[in-house]
Amino acid sequence: MKEVGIVGYGSDLPKYRIKAEDIAGAWGKDAQAIKRGLVVNEKSVPGPDEDTATIAVQSARRALSRAGINPKDIGAVYVGSESHPYAVKPTSGIVAEACGVSPDFTAADLEFACKAGTAGIQMCMGLVGSEMMEYAMAVGADTAQGAPGDALEYTAAAGGAAFIIGAKKEEFIAKFNGTYSYTTDTPDFWRREHEHYPKHGGRFTGEPAYFKHVLNGAKGMMEKMGTTSKDYDYCVFHQPNGKFYLTAAKKLGFTEEQYKYGLLTPYLGNTYSGAVPLGLSNILDHAKADDRIFVVSYGSGAGSDAFDITVTDRISEVVDKEITTEKLLEQKKYVDYAVYLKYRGKIRM
């Protein structure tokens, strides 16, 4: 199988934010205790004209801009999300049409809770590495929902990132050294058809779910590559909240210098399928040639995908071709709880 790498990437975030204090105030909760417990200060809120498709399209267009390739050369488009706008009508087709990819390509919408985006990256790696196509695109994006008053309401956010995978070494922004996955049947978080909001197992979502899969996924990747945390310059993990992320990073031996760029949850919330892709995009925005990145996603149900990535010198040529994730984070406008309820369609008659 041929070596494959990232040849283009892009991200997108809504500009609206709501502070933890506004949510807590509406429910008579202690905002400071919640912020300390979750390590989340505020989260993104999609506007009334934003959904997973619009976020995916904008991310994909930015990825194409950085890649500098003809969109017609892309042979596959995958969009991973648990908040696709339609139950029956592919988001991937919308993205491809908006980006000028169609009609000569294959597409699919993916679901695996919060790791659907990284599952798409693995599929693209296989298709390009086997020489079935020249390029493939994977997007991870979500506009997540939490029931009013539930703990998820402080974290369920919106955002996404796209990655174009290719096999021409001279086009690599970053090279994949390897990937590894760890998957079980663990019912920590779920939502049935026709239900508006997901249910979760509370504390059960920690040790037997998130930590078991992220830590085993990470250890499996390191064993496969013969590495330790000291061999990497940066890392990013799935981040349902800041506390879980920091705990996982420290258990694996990573330092603040290694994990700081991947950690976006305190300022953004949990963007679900977009969480690890956004963290990786922010790392790439700050990385330099030969930096090595360790990536582990997590999707409830449950599974983790891990990646070992090395950045190339081409990164310096493409970063400034599009807006960075950090700049998107800085472009924000706060809304109160009433506007948040309106924008998220939570006021039901």
UniProtKB/Swiss-Prot annotation:
<comment type="subunit">
    <text>Interacts with acetoacetyl-CoA thiolase that catalyzes the precedent step in the pathway and with a DUF35 protein. The acetoacetyl-CoA thiolase/HMG-CoA synthase complex channels the intermediate via a fused CoA-binding site, which allows for efficient coupling of the endergonic thiolase reaction with the exergonic HMGCS reaction.</text>
</comment>
<feature type="binding site">
    <location>
        <position position="270"/>
    </location>
    <ligand>
        <name>(3S)-3-hydroxy-3-methylglutaryl-CoA</name>
    </ligand>
</feature>
<dbReference type="GO" id="GO:0010142">
    <property type="term" value="P:farnesyl diphosphate biosynthetic process, mevalonate pathway"/>
</dbReference>
<feature type="binding site">
    <location>
        <position position="243"/>
    </location>
    <ligand>
        <name>CoA</name>
    </ligand>
</feature>
<feature type="binding site">
    <location>
        <position position="30"/>
    </location>
    <ligand>
        <name>(3S)-3-hydroxy-3-methylglutaryl-CoA</name>
    </ligand>
</feature>
<comment type="pathway">
    <text>Metabolic intermediate biosynthesis; (R)-mevalonate biosynthesis; (R)-mevalonate from acetyl-CoA: step 2/3.</text>
</comment>
<keyword id="KW-0808">Transferase</keyword>
<dbReference type="InterPro" id="IPR013747">
    <property type="entry name" value="ACP_syn_III_C"/>
</dbReference>
<feature type="binding site">
    <location>
        <position position="300"/>
    </location>
    <ligand>
        <name>(3S)-3-hydroxy-3-methylglutaryl-CoA</name>
    </ligand>
</feature>
<keyword id="KW-0414">Isoprene biosynthesis</keyword>
<dbReference type="Pfam" id="PF08541">
    <property type="entry name" value="ACP_syn_III_C"/>
</dbReference>
<comment type="function">
    <text>Catalyzes the condensation of acetyl-CoA with acetoacetyl-CoA to form 3-hydroxy-3-methylglutaryl-CoA (HMG-CoA). Functions in the mevalonate (MVA) pathway leading to isopentenyl diphosphate (IPP), a key precursor for the biosynthesis of isoprenoid compounds that are building blocks of archaeal membrane lipids.</text>
</comment>
<protein>
    <recommendedName>
        <fullName>Hydroxymethylglutaryl-CoA synthase</fullName>
        <ecNumber>2.3.3.10</ecNumber>
    </recommendedName>
</protein>
<dbReference type="InterPro" id="IPR004656">
    <property type="entry name" value="HMG_CoA_Synthase"/>
</dbReference>
<feature type="binding site">
    <location>
        <position position="205"/>
    </location>
    <ligand>
        <name>(3S)-3-hydroxy-3-methylglutaryl-CoA</name>
    </ligand>
</feature>
<feature type="binding site">
    <location>
        <position position="114"/>
    </location>
    <ligand>
        <name>(3S)-3-hydroxy-3-methylglutaryl-CoA</name>
    </ligand>
</feature>
<dbReference type="GO" id="GO:0019287">
    <property type="term" value="P:isopentenyl diphosphate biosynthetic process, mevalonate pathway"/>
</dbReference>
<feature type="binding site">
    <location>
        <position position="203"/>
    </location>
    <ligand>
        <name>CoA</name>
    </ligand>
</feature>
<feature type="binding site">
    <location>
        <position position="155"/>
    </location>
    <ligand>
        <name>(3S)-3-hydroxy-3-methylglutaryl-CoA</name>
    </ligand>
</feature>
<feature type="active site" description="Proton donor/acceptor">
    <location>
        <position position="238"/>
    </location>
</feature>
<keyword id="KW-0012">Acyltransferase</keyword>
<feature type="binding site">
    <location>
        <position position="238"/>
    </location>
    <ligand>
        <name>(3S)-3-hydroxy-3-methylglutaryl-CoA</name>
    </ligand>
</feature>
<dbReference type="GO" id="GO:0003985">
    <property type="term" value="F:acetyl-CoA C-acetyltransferase activity"/>
</dbReference>
<feature type="active site" description="Acyl-thioester intermediate">
    <location>
        <position position="114"/>
    </location>
</feature>
<dbReference type="InterPro" id="IPR016039">
    <property type="entry name" value="Thiolase-like"/>
</dbReference>
<feature type="active site" description="Proton donor/acceptor">
    <location>
        <position position="82"/>
    </location>
</feature>
<dbReference type="GO" id="GO:0004421">
    <property type="term" value="F:hydroxymethylglutaryl-CoA synthase activity"/>
</dbReference>
<comment type="similarity">
    <text>Belongs to the thiolase-like superfamily. Archaeal HMG-CoA synthase family.</text>
</comment>
<feature type="binding site">
    <location>
        <position position="31"/>
    </location>
    <ligand>
        <name>(3S)-3-hydroxy-3-methylglutaryl-CoA</name>
    </ligand>
</feature>
